[in-house]
Each structure stands twice: as structure tokens, then as C-alpha cells.
Amino acid sequence: VLFRSIVGTKTDYFGIPILANILTGANGFSEVWGTKLELLWYYFKLLILPWPLSWDYSYSEIPVMSLSHPLAWISMVLHAGLLAFVFLRFRKQPFLSFAILFFLVMMAPTNNFFIYNTTTLGERLMFVPSLSICLALVFIAGKLTKTDWKLSAPLLQNNSIKILLPVILIFSIMTISRSADWKNNLSLFKSGVEVCPNSSRTNYSLASEYFKQAQKTGNDELKKEYLQKAGQLFQRSVEILPENYQDRK
């Protein structure tokens, strides 16, 4: 990944619109690296607390950020600390060190730090890296309850389950709640605008869906309402990103 980033540094962003990846709108060393560190922070946040969620995080929900912003430094210290822990504690804490290293390595190809891609931030890119938090939670639960994982014991009699079950329950409820947003395009795009109101794409997509609904309905009042909402959202999308070609069609 590092070699690919060095070789492709000058061409990785070629042809990628700012609507897809905000890094193409970053100018100079400070903005490029400040924004990269900002994205690392958001990916870490998704790992620890994946709520609220959106199907899209494009321009300008996540703004271009310079190195003068505190969040960039917080992210830098955080990730430097994670790397330091891996190298300094690997022999004494191999399980937790592996979990951290797994997260960092699995995120490397898609988090825009080394290689630009066509997504500013994507929850789907966390599918494999999220295994790291599962490993870390098992380790932490075992430490808190002084569980010896080498000893075989019935699962429900394991003290660590007292910690893990509530966590599993909470995240299961969050998953079920989030799944409701995926009922159809209208519900999904509505939730996208609610969570990411500053994304040109979420506004455009909901506007397009309202326009489609207006064409389908036979109710004149409802059609008028849908078209009015579509117009407002199209306007908002253009305000966020005037060069969004989709809204000019």
C-alpha cells in the first residue's frame, strides 16, 4: 500500500470529482494532511461509536481541514499512540496489539491516507476492520473479569459474558433501528439528509426521489408537495456545491 501510494501520488486523484472525495479539493500540504487525519478520526469514531449513520458522507458534510485545526492533532496523537502501543507492547499484550494492528492495516487501502479512492468516507469500508473492535472487546472483558481463556468452561458461566452480552444487545438494537432506514429509497434518503444535511449528494438524492414520487402519485395535492420539497432540496444541493452537474440536468 505504501509503495502504491508513493508511485501513484500524482495520479491517484486524477478524474475524481470533489463530490466523491473532498481530498481533491484540498490545497497544499496543510489541507491535504489535515484532511487525511480528519478522515482517520471519523473512521476511528465509526469503529467505536457507529451512530448516527448515513449512506453518504460526501461534500461538504466532512469539510476540508488544515493542520491548524485541533481535530487533526487529536487524530495524529491518537493514531501515533495506537502505533506506539503495538510496537512497544506487542510481546506483553499480543492479543490487543494484534487487534489494533489489524484495524490499522485493514483500513490502509481504503481510508484515503495512502491511496485516494472515490469515496470520502464509507461505512461499508469498515466491514473487515470492524473485526478488530470485536477482538478488543473480548480482550477487555477478559481482563476486567480475570477470565482465563485457556480454561474450557460453559459459555454462559463465563464471567466475561456479563460484560459482552449488554454490549451485543446495545449494538443489536442499533442495527435493527438502522435497518429500518433501508426500507426503501425514500426512507434511506430522508435519513441521509437528517444525518448529513450538508452533503450535496444526500440532498440531491432525496430531491430526485421526491420528484419520482411526484410522477407516480395521482393525488394533485401530494404531487404539489413532493415537487415543492424536491425543488427546495435541489436548491440546497446546488448551494452546497454549485458545480454539481447532476443538479443542472
Predicted regions and their residues:
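Polytopic membrane enzymes that build or remodel cell-surface glycoconjugates and lipids
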Residues: 1-248
